């Protein structure tokens, strides 16, 4: 009852608006009278009146743009307020649009006031040609419009007799009247009562949801049937295996008692064992009594199958694709962006995916090599939220691949557009999180790092990290990882020194975060910026060592060792030589260690689906945009490269969260040589109990009183671990190398030339022998070894909530 009262006035207003729209005047009067009698308050201004006033404003704006010859403003309003169905199917709308295109194409020639802007004329004619090749192509067979297809190619159309009529004032006045009449009818039809709109949207959403559920049901039933067959087969094999095992145990017992096993018995057992994997006759024809036959077949039965060749995708007409991405309607743009993304994300890693990526790059899909006013990257500023989101998702896929990062980094304006989009979007929007992920992955490239630092992105990131309540796990993880990557550069550390107190307080708040990966990035950022003496002094004055020792946790050896290295850096007296800028050189070094990794959830929670009879995905591309076969790219697939950093140290090479995660998985399965068991021994003598919580702003963080290792043991062990001779002793012939991350000395100063950027993608587990062409800063194996992840951010699953309102 309380909910009804809360929305009662709005509901009554909906009823009143509908009765007024349907001209039920007597019913409306009775309804209004009864509401007044019962003390029910009706809204003073009906929704219909508001809609009518809005319609008049829209109509006025369109007419004004028509009279001023403002082609951009006019067609932006046209696309926004004229229904797509009307534009595509209504003959009156199509003919009117054709004449409107002519009006705007010749507008500078008719209203030149003695001076013609040639650049403006060329742009308008080019726009008209594009229209004729796309939307206007449907009218090419109509006699009425056929002469106008030659208009863009006539040097002086005003003097041509075929076009004499359209340059007369009466033609423009008549066209204006037709436009006003059309708008009054169409816009009024679109101003339906909210009650009808709610009903239609609900009905449409229900139908769409039903289609999705039916599709999911079909897929689930198919999977269930497949799994059931697999289960039945496994169950049968299991029962058969148990029976064979029981017989073999009986045979072994009989052998112990002196009874012999006959060849016939062995043949029958092996026939039973292999009967499910081959035909009965084939199993019986094999002589299992020969030594090694049965065991060889058993081993061969579990050998991995030879990888099958994956076919390449058909080539596409990229010029037509880019035209539709720039000039098509919003739904078509979204469907194309979705299909292009799916082609990358749903392709098989290796030659198939590499060929798709190289085709996109060679055809300049994102117009990174062009500076036209209208290009695909401008879709980031589209008024449609779905188009912006799907554009960001496609760029995100590019940024997840090494060659893709090289490609999109070649557009100097892209980074600025991404940063502006990130700042402009709402705090918890999907687009903002996607753009953040792109920026983080681009921070693997040194040129991008330099540009981000020059744009003061570090201070924006500090502001973001200051209030983490509005950040999802994904956003927090990628924000701190991006911040760490920028802090690994000398210029980034200098930037942090401008506001050292603020930066240190924000990082100290994050030291107690429950997520292991986030703490790793915080530790890496702290270790890096503490190389600057002024930041060290500020940290000492705020009691940073006491704060750090508070977070040394019992049982978390990796984090404890990180903190010990940070404390050692904090107490160091080394000077920061600003003349050494080896890590700020713009040359891309060691890019061959960079690796590809697509996040598993890039296609999760799609917000548009193909309607009945509508093409989407690969069907859309191969039906409407099939091109000449050009898939002949042979891309050399780079193997895992890079070297492993000791898990004891804070991160000192740029990283991306999912890379860091995969790297630790690799380390667990084929990990580097472990230090001797006496590494970092702790005893009661070299442990000190922290008795009270230090003065820190992270009071909400949960922590316990733990122990910490004394720095003496760290010094001795670090010198042993970082020495080349010690490393040579530790690794065998096939063991991955441990990166020598000992701080190299140049004239007595620290050098950090071994530090490179990272992104949460895939890291390498083996060294590369041959250098491949320069791509981007490497992924390396520098993260601490992880034994478990918090459920909050241990996976990179985005907390993306899709925009459901566009499901149409």
From Swiss-Prot:
Record region (Disordered): 576-599, 650-709, 742-808
Keyword Coiled coil: yes
Regions annotated as coiled coil: 196-230
Domain LisH: 7-39
GO BP: any one term: cilium assembly
Key word Chaperone present: no
InterPro entries in UniProt: ARM-like, ARM-type_fold, ARMC9, ARMC9_ARM_dom, ARMC9_CTLH-like_dom, ARMC9_LisH, LisH
PROSITE patterns assigned: LISH
SUPFAM superfamilies in UniProt: ARM repeat (SSF48371)
Residue ranges with Low complexity bias: 785-808
Keywords for the protein's UniProt record, in alphabetical order: Cell projection, Cilium biogenesis/degradation, Coiled coil, Cytoplasm, Cytoskeleton
Major subcellular site: cytoplasm
GO CC, alphabetical: centriole; ciliary basal body; ciliary tip; cilium; cytoplasm
Organism domain of life: Eukaryota
Record localization: Cytoplasm, Cytoskeleton, Cilium basal body; Cell projection, Cilium; Cytoplasm, Cytoskeleton, Microtubule organizing center, Centrosome, Centriole
Extent of Polar residues compositional bias: 655-668, 677-709, 775-784
Biased composition (Acidic residues): 579-599
Known function: Involved in ciliogenesis. It is required for appropriate acetylation and polyglutamylation of ciliary microtubules, and regulation of cilium length. Acts as a positive regulator of hedgehog (Hh)signaling.
Protein name: LisH domain-containing protein ARMC9
């Amino acid at each position: 009852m309380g909910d009804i009262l809360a929305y009662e006035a709005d509901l009554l207003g909906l009823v009143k608006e509908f009765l007024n729209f349907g001209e039920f005047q007597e019913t409306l009067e009775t309804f209004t009278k009864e509401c007044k009698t019962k003390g029910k308050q009706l809204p003073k201004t009906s929704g219909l009146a508001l809609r009518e006033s809005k319609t008049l404003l829209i109509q006025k704006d369109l007419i004004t743009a028509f009279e001023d010859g403002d082609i951009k403003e006019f067609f932006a309003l046209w696309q926004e307020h004229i229904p797509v169905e009307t534009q595509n199917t209504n003959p009156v709308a199509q003919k009117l649009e054709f004449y409107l295109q002519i009006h705007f194409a010749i507008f500078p020639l008719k209203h030149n006031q003695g001076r013609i802007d040639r650049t403006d004329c060329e742009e308008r004619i080019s726009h008209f040609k594009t229209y004729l090749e796309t939307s206007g192509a449907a009218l090419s067979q109509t006699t009425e419009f056929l002469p106008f297809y030659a208009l863009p190619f006539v040097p002086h159309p005003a003097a041509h007799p075929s076009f004499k009529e359209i340059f007369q004032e009466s033609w423009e006045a008549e066209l204006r009247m037709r436009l006003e009449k059309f708008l009054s009818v169409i816009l009024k039809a679109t101003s339906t009562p909210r009650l009808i709109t709610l009903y239609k949207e609900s009905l449409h959403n229900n139908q769409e949801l039903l289609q999705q559920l039916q599709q999911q049901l079909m897929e689930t039933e198919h999977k269930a049937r497949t799994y059931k067959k697999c289960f039945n087969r496994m169950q049968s094999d299991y029962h058969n295996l148990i029976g064979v095992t029981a017989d073999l145990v009986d045979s072994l017992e009989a052998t112990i008692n002196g009874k012999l096993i006959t060849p016939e018995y062995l043949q029958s057992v092996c026939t039973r064992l292999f009967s499910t994997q081959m035909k009965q006759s084939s199993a019986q024809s094999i002589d299992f009594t020969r030594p090694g036959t049965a065991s060889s077949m058993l081993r061969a039965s579990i050998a991995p199958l030879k990888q099958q060749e994956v076919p390449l995708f058909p080539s596409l007409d990229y010029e037509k694709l880019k035209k539709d991405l720039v000039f098509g309607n919003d739904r078509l743009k979204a469907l194309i962006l979705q299909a292009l993304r799916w082609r990358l994300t749903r392709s098989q890693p290796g030659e198939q995916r590499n060929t798709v990526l190289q085709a996109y790059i060679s055809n300049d899909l994102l117009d990174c090599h062009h500076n036209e006013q209208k290009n695909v990257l401008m879709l980031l500023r589209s008024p449609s939220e779905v188009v912006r989101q799907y554009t960001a998702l496609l760029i995100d896929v590019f940024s997840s691949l090494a060659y893709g990062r090289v490609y999109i980094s070649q557009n100097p304006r892209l980074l600025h557009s991404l940063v502006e989009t990130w700042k402009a979007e709402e705090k918890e929007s999907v687009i903002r999180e996607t753009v953040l992920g792109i920026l983080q992955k681009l921070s693997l490239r040194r040129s991008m790092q330099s540009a981000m630092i020059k744009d003061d992105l570090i201070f924006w990131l500090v502001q973001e990290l200051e209030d983490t309540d509005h950040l999802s796990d994904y956003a927090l993880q990628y924000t701190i990882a991006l911040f760490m990557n920028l802090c690994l550069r000398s210029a980034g550390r200098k930037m942090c020194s401008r506001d050292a107190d603020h930066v240190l307080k924000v990082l100290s708040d994050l030291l107690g975060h429950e997520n292991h990966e986030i703490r790793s990035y915080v530790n890496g950022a702290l270790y890096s910026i503490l190389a600057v003496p002024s930041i060290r002094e500020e940290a000492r004055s705020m009691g940073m060592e006491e704060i750090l020792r508070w977070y040394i946790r019992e049982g978390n050896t990796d984090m404890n060792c990180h903190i010990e290295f940070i404390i050692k850096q904090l107490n160091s007296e080394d000077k920061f030589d600003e003349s050494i800028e080896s890590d700020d050189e713009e040359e891309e070094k060691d890019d061959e260690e960079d690796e590809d990794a697509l996040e598993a959830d890039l296609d999760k929670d799609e917000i548009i689906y193909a309607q009945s009879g509508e093409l989407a995905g690969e069907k859309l591309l191969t039906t409407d945009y099939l091109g000449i076969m050009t898939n002949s790219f042979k891309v050399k697939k780079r193997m895992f490269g890079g070297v492993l950093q000791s898990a004891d140290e804070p991160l000192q090479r740029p990283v991306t969260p999912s890379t860091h995660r995969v790297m630790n998985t690799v380390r667990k399965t084929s990990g580097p040589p472990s230090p001797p068991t006496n590494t970092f021994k702790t005893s009661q003598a070299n442990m000190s109990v922290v008795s009270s919580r230090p003065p820190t702003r992270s009071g909400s963080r949960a922590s316990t009183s733990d122990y910490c290792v004394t720095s003496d043991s760290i010094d001795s062990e670090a010198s042993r671990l970082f020495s080349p001779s010690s490393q040579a002793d530790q690794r065998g012939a096939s063991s991955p190398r441990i990166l020598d991350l000992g701080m190299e000395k140049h004239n007595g100063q620290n050098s950090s030339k071994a530090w490179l950027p990272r992104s949460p993608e895939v890291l390498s587990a083996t060294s590369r022998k041959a250098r491949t062409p320069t791509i981007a800063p490497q992924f390396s194996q520098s993260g601490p070894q992880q034994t478990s992840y918090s459920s909050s951010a241990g996976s990179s699953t985005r907390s993306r909530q899709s925009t459901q309102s566009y499901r149409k």
